[in-house]
UniProtKB/Swiss-Prot annotation:
InterPro entries, alphabetized: Adenovir_t-Ag_E1B_19kDa, Bcl2-like
Gene Ontology biological-process annotations: symbiont-mediated suppression of host apoptosis
Keyword Metal-binding annotated: no
Keyword Zinc assigned: no
Protein name: E1B protein, small T-antigen
Key words, A-Z: Early protein, Host-virus interaction, Inhibition of host apoptosis by viral BCL2-like protein, Modulation of host cell apoptosis by virus
Family: Belongs to the adenoviridae E1B 19 kDa protein family.
Recorded superkingdom: Viruses
Spans through the membrane: none
Native source organism of the sequence: Canine adenovirus serotype 1 (strain RI261) (CAdV-1)
Length: 169
């Protein structure tokens, strides 16, 4: 299952994120794409880690309460790395986590929240996918004689830990 391929269509992506916010059960499995169930299960399993990233006292929640979403999402999306399925699923789960825990006293209606989260995220996913396709289409001669930037920046010990698991230990 390639999450980015499945999320190429905005309405499908939106439906997956919406479905992942529902409680586990027959409704989520029957009504939404299978990826929504996978993402929802990741959110439930890793909710503690998400709360460590964005605790209840974090400024992000106050911004969401006031309806300010552009700056927080710009910050989140500019650092986004989607090079493997684990990171892709973790990102989708994080979006679902944000929607599930959006302050109930926010000035943003529940209907608008979904699009405020999905539109910039989907745009970033499309940019990432297009860039990856362009890089894959480059001839091999372009890369000859050049070491991998990732290897130089991260070192082999970090690369050995990279995985399709969204939260490898």
């Amino acid at each position: 299952m390639d999450p980015l391929k499945i999320c190429e269509n905005y309405l499908t992506f939106r439906s997956i994120i919406k479905g992942s916010t529902f409680s586990p059960g027959v409704f989520r499995r029957w009504r939404f794409h299978a990826l929504a169930d996978v993402v929802g299960n990741i959110v439930e399993r890793e909710e503690g880690r998400f709360w460590e990233i964005v605790p209840e006292t974090h400024t992000l929640w106050a911004l969401f309460r006031g309806g300010f979403t552009v700056a927080p999402f710009t910050e989140i999306l500019t650092s986004l790395q989607l090079e493997n399925r684990g990171r892709q699923l973790a990102f989708l789960a994080f979006l679902s986590f944000l929607l599930r825990n959006w302050p109930s006293d926010s000035v943003v209606s529940e209907d608008a929240r979904l699009d405020l989260v999905c539109a910039p995220a989907w745009s970033r996913i499309q940019i990432w996918s297009q860039a990856a396709r362009l890089i894959n289409d480059l001839p091999e001669s372009v890369f000859e004689g050049q070491g991998s930037v990732v290897e130089e920046e991260c070192g082999e010990e970090h690369l050995a830990r990279d995985s399709d698991d969204p939260f490898f230990d």
